Swiss-Prot record:
HAMAP family found in the cross-reference section: UPF0397 (MF_01572)
GO cellular component: plasma membrane
Keyword Nucleotidyltransferase: no
Localisation: Cell membrane
Main location: membrane
TM ranges: 9-29, 40-60, 71-91, 114-134, 142-162
NCBIfam families: PRK13661.1 (NF010182)
Membrane topology summary: Multi-pass membrane protein
Sequence similarity: Belongs to the UPF0397 family.
Protein name per Swiss-Prot or TrEMBL: UPF0397 protein BCG9842_B2659
Keyword vocabulary terms for this entry: Cell membrane, Membrane, Transmembrane, Transmembrane helix
Length: 182
């Protein structure tokens, strides 16, 4: 098993704290369902540090949100945040892609968009199924939550997460070619 570097552990801690605290704010769109801008944190940190970091940031951060909010930990939704973070981090495994160095192309952006959207859909369906099967939640309530959560997460991903990640990569590209003059 690969060891986690100190840098990666620190990034996971910072990402989880940001995701956990920012996850407390959102705009209600369905029963217990919110548009939460915090999802952009999973996109940026996943793209920067990879799928393992994205997974752990999602799991830890969502647990922090649920704990602080006081509504109990909803494990299906915690796991779904981990799945989303993992899917956002898959882009980091593409050869030649690097947010840190500003190295990306249209194919990378498409890949991030596709893996992000597929990850969101899989994660939210998992959370809904978990709530019905394990938590005994009513089917009709969960259908509304799943639809609302999917729509809200897709909106946040496309409007905030993807543009922030691309913007950060573009910004780093400008600075990657700077040289120290002697």
């Amino acid at each position: 098993m690969n060891k986690l570097s100190t840098k990666l552990v620190v990034a996971i801690g910072i990402g989880a704290a940001l995701y956990g605290i920012l996850g407390l704010w959102g705009f209600s769109i369905a029963p217990n369902t919110f548009i939460k801008p915090a999802l952009a944190i999973l996109t940026v940190f996943g793209a920067l540090f990879g799928p393992v970091a994205g997974l752990l940031i999602g799991l830890i951060g969502h647990t922090v949100t649920d704990t602080i909010a006081g509504w109990g930990i909803w494990w299906g939704w915690v796991i779904s945040s981990g799945i989303i973070g993992f899917s956002m981090g898959l882009i980091q495994k593409r050869v030649g892609f690097s947010v840190k160095n500003g190295s990306f192309n249209k194919g990378d952006i498409s890949y991030l968009a596709i893996t992000g959207l597929v990850g969101i859909v899989i994660a939210i369906i998992f959370a809904g199924a978990f709530d019905i099967i394990v938590m005994g939640e009513p089917f009709d309530k969960i259908v509304i939550q799943v639809l609302g959560a999917t729509i809200s997460d897709v909106i946040v991903f496309l409007v905030l997460g993807l543009p922030l990640t691309i913007g950060l990569a573009k910004s780093n590209k400008k600075h990657a070619h700077l040289k120290i003059e002697k």
